[in-house]
């Protein structure tokens, strides 16, 4: 067994991936702004805390599930950004469920809709995590 020292680790290929949950005003968005070359998908008008910083973002306040997916695909392809920040996953989940209900012509989700919701959210999160970029889901 070869003993290694942590100071010799090459971290250049390691991508940060995290989910942060907390009350409003606890610094989640500010944390996201510290990620390398971040790109924010802003779904809840919560970027006031990073106003004035050199951070790119797109407003997705009244977007559809398809628009969010398309924007994520563009962010993944962007050579100008090293990190994808989703703010907030709660909004993503609401829009996802709304989309599923619309597809099934329902006003409210029924038992059968929850599996589709789970699969859609899992796919979305895996796409973010496996994007080859740093990622933070708020």
Specify the residue positions occupied by each region the protein language model found.
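Conserved P-loop
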Residues: 2-95
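P-loop NTPase motor core
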Residues: 83, 88-138
């Amino acid at each position: 067994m070869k003993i290694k020292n942590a100071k010799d680790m090459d971290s250049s290929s390691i991508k940060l991936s995290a989910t942060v949950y907390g009350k409003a005003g606890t610094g989640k968005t500010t944390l996201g702004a510290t990620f390398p070359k971040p790109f924010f998908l802003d779904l809840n008008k919560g970027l006031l805390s990073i106003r004035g910083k050199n951070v790119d973002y797109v407003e997705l306040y009244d977007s559809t599930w398809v628009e969010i997916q398309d924007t994520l695909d563009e962010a993944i392809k962007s050579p100008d950004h090293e990190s994808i920040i989703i703010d907030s996953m709660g909004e993503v989940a609401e829009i996802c469920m709304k989309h599923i209900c619309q597809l099934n012509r329902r006003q409210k989700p029924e038992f059968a809709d929850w599996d589709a919701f789970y699969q859609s959210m899992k796919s979305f999160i895996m796409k973010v995590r496996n994007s080859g970029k740093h990622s933070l889901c708020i």
